[in-house]
Amino acid sequence: MSFSQESGTHHNSLDYAGVSDEEDEIDILGEDDPCSLKSHFYLQPTHSDMGDSGMLSPSKLSCTESESDSSGESEGGTSKDSPATSPGGKAKRALVKPPYSYIALITMAILQSPHKKLTLSGICDFISSKFPYYKDKFPAWQNSIRHNLSLNDCFIKIPREPGNPGKGNYWTLDPASEDMFDNGSFLRRRKRFKRHQQEFFKDGLMMYNSLPYYRPYSALQPQPMLQQTPLACMAIPETLSMPTNLTPYPDIKRKAHYPDQGAHRGFEGQDANNHPNKSQSKCSFSIENIMKKPKEPEPSFPSFNSHWNYNNHLLQRPSSCFLPAVLNLSTGPLLANVQGTRQYNLIKFPGSY
């Protein structure tokens, strides 16, 4: 007995017994139906304009909604077959960050260039063309490339040549950093490269205009210094003094008999210990000392005592190492011993403080 035949025997209402019989038949039919008819079928009053199936008509929309609810897609969000999320999700999963450090990426870019040197823009172009991840993230990582170039010793900055116009300097690899990566693999470095102090000196020579700075710094040879141990100071005996005002030899010979009164007063107070006279022990600022004509001291020539022990390396040095006033000691009495005084003018030589 089919469902349509059972519904045709009733006209306006159903008995309680009739309803129970129909529910038993619905259970039988629900065994093969993918929708659970017990929970989703419901009774509706029949109308004249409805067909035979209008009394107990399961809604297809309710069935499809039940399927979607049972799968958990209608309440949980969008379905797996949604075209909006699947292409975007697949595209994001495809852009995986490469397992290389920035130093490895820069090294790849420099090694593939014909001249083994590139600018910052050339390095960024190479990385963007080889790795889609960095192409999508550009220019967020450009500053990281710039910082790695300037902070790592394995990269050398080469200024542009005068006849090569353009923007930015070139960057190349240090020749001593070729074994920086383990077995040529860019995935792992052996150790951090450190440049030696001598190589720092060579790198500094490249910045001068008079040198071929466009060459690699390894081709430059350090210039030998003219004087390895410059003369700092020269030991002068205590008996050696030097006049304050340097004058030529004829003037010194002429003025030696007429010294200044101020210098004589300064020397007079210091010679009191060597010549204990009552006249010299008086105050140097008295009227008698000021009005009295000073004695004319005899000029004395420099006396080289036995305790003058000059080293051979000082005597063998060129004359340009000494002051011009000390060049000609034998030509005139430039240095005089003034009555054994111990107040001298210190001679400062180049390099002394």
Swiss-Prot record:
Induction: By FGF-signaling. Inhibited by bmp-signaling. Residues 1-32, 48-92, 254-281 are annotated as: Disordered. It is found in: Nucleus. Residues 97-191 bind DNA. Residues 271-281 have a biased composition (Polar residues). CDD domains: FH_FOXD4-like. Gene3D superfamilies: Winged helix-like DNA-binding domain superfamily/Winged helix DNA-binding domain (1.10.10.10). It comes from the Eukaryota. The keyword Transcription applies. Keywords: Developmental protein, Differentiation, DNA-binding, Neurogenesis, Nucleus, Repressor, Transcription, Transcription regulation. InterPro entries: Fork_head_dom, FOX_domain-containing, TF_fork_head_CS_1, TF_fork_head_CS_2, WH-like_DNA-bd_sf, WH_DNA-bd_sf. GO terms for molecular function: DNA binding; DNA-binding transcription factor activity; DNA-binding transcription factor activity, RNA polymerase II-specific; RNA polymerase II cis-regulatory region sequence-specific DNA binding. This is Forkhead box protein D5-B. It comes from Xenopus laevis. The lineage of its organism: Eukaryota, Metazoa, Chordata, Craniata, Vertebrata.
